[in-house]
């Protein structure tokens, strides 16, 4: 936009202002990559969630990003919006990715994502800490036709769970099992997959 002003002496001045178009960001699950860093040597089972933006797939705008842990409604580990679409050191859970135009030109765009995390151990001793073996980030909203099977070292099924269950308490037929290695098989069928 160019504006011209003229005063009483016939002097004029031109000023050019650039207006950048801004659209509501378009965010799709295909833009999100969840990387499990647990397989790396020396890792402490940290997760990293990143948003890959290819060739301005979000639309026109100058965007910033935030992530909200829906389990406790905190923007973890960040206090607010940031310019980098990368979030690291997350635990398993359901997260809301939020994108907005940094100039406030459009409302937030949001997307819920599931970040799966399997615990390496649990301590079912009723102290309130790690008393249940729970798969974090799995629920019926994301995985409606899913199940979890837990086996002892000899292959005997000791527990069968749904993803929304409280978790496994380390018992079989009401009796506490010994401290040992147990194996699990989890079948996660996403909600958008039809049989």
PLM region spans:
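Hydrophobic beta-strand segments within extracellular beta-sandwich modules
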Residues: 1, 95-97, 180, 184
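Short loop/turn motifs at secondary-structure boundaries
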Residues: 53, 82, 91, 103-104, ...
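Short, compositionally biased serine/threonine- and acidic-rich segments at solvent-exposed termini, linkers
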Residues: 4-121, 126, 130, 140-141
């Amino acid at each position: 936009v160019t504006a011209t002003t003229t005063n009483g002496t016939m002097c004029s001045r031109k000023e050019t202002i650039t207006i950048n178009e801004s659209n509501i960001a378009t965010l799709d699950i295909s833009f999100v990559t969840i990387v499990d860093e647990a397989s790396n040597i020396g890792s402490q089972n940290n997760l990293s969630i990143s948003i890959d933006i290819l060739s301005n797939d979000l639309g026109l705008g100058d965007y910033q990003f935030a992530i909200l842990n829906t389990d406790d409604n905190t923007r973890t580990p960040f206090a607010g919006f940031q310019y980098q679409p990368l979030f690291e050191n997350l635990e398993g859970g359901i997260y809301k990715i939020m994108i907005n135009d940094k100039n406030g030109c459009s409302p937030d765009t949001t997307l819920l994502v599931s970040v799966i995390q399997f615990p390496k151990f649990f301590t079912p001793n009723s102290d309130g800490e790690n008393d249940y073996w729970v798969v974090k980030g799995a629920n019926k909203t994301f995985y409606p036709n899913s199940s979890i099977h837990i086996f002892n070292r000899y292959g005997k099924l000791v527990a069968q769970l749904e993803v929304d269950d409280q978790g496994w308490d380390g018992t079989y037929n009401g009796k506490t099992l010994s401290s040992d290695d147990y194996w699990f098989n989890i079948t996660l069928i996403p909600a958008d997959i039809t049989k």
